[in-house]
Amino acid sequence: MAFNMDPKKCPMPTQDPNVRNKNFEEVAQGYTEEMAVNEAKRCIHCKNKPCQTGCPVGIDIPEFIGHVAEGDFEAAYQVIARSSSLPAVCGRVCPQESQCEGKCTRGIKNEPVGIGRLERFVADWHRENVHTAPIVPAWNGHKVAIIGAGPAGLTAAGDLAKLGYKVTVYEALHVAGGVLMYGIPEFRLPKAIVQQEIDGLKKMGVDFECNMVIGKVLTIDELMGEYGYEAVFVGSGAGLPRFMGIPGESLKGVYSANEFLTRSNLMKAYLPTSKTPIRTGKKVAVVGGGNVAMDAARSALRLGAETVYIVYRRGMAELPARKEEVEHAEEEGIIFKTLCNPVEIHANDEGFVKSITCIEMELGEPDASGRRRPIEKTGSEFELDVDTVIMSLGTSPNPLIRSTTPGLETNKHGCIVTEGDEGKTSREGVYAGGDAVTGAATVIKAMGAGKAAAKAMDEYIQNQ
């Protein structure tokens, strides 16, 4: 097979920025078969597979890419499916530049192989062309409970179902999917794709119980007692928003990004018939610089805002959001106000937001995270006229589970404490992973935690 030594990735077809910023259709439109084969031929098949070491779920990346290069897309899918339950999701939202593609040898001198784009292509090809029912293994006589139907819970459920366990997933919201459904907008991750992944788990025998808030409706003790589950995995995420604690945060027109995106993504607040409409003003400030901030800003634009600012206390180079998301936001007309931070939100006579006062920042010495610490510049305050403020400052786990589960150790941030990478908690038979343990992180890291915990749960039960 001849290698393709093009120094750049095959470009991803996308909607025109001036069209897409007015709709919720998917921005990136995916590779054609020809594009996928050509991109796959850029892989030089390193013997030590550095890209695989960068994948939290351990996909054999050179093997699946080799099948793509040969045009055998179903064989490529089967390689991915050995390690990942959600390839169509990961191909769209994983930060490949800091994981698999960040380790790619081609990326040392040129652009890395477009691993995420190829994973997406393979998953989409399989979904559109293969319609065989999954193989359902015989029941092994054991049953387990999963708390939370987000990426960690879905991954653990899928892996345990493949081993023959009777798996029940308890989800607090009215639909399964967790952050994949409520947190990531349709234009980045279509909900039909997430639903299809969930439907695949249902076909494998996984049961989903929605509108079940564990800690209120049932406790972990009840699940392991009268309900007879031999092990429980807690993948309840981190959905409790953080705020700055500045004057004016309780004004009308101030949202957490969590609420703003949930109402838009899950409750379709952008439809005229919506029962949960969002009051998006003409000028919106989104405070924060991560992927969630980009999602909120780009959603606000699509909901009718004329001007949307990203207000971030560090510089453009320090933005934690994916490079692709920042580029897409800039293309769509989002204005980046970096090296500044809000200090107060002001109201009009009716109690609605009318402006925010910000202060300019400069970067000092590195802090504990390794990033340079932002320092206020005395006397540099300025006012920004906005009528909506969206706070995107991270999230913490909900305290319900820890407050209703005696003996479950948590840290000062409310995250569940686990041993090593296996997800074992201080309670026997209780495992945890994803954002409930780490705080807000990436989809693929949550999946990796769910995968590791499923393996540990199986070993625990089989050794009883």
PLM feature segments, named:
Residues 122-138, 196-216, 241-303, 411-421, ...:
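Glycine-rich dinucleotide-binding loop and its adjacent helix/turn
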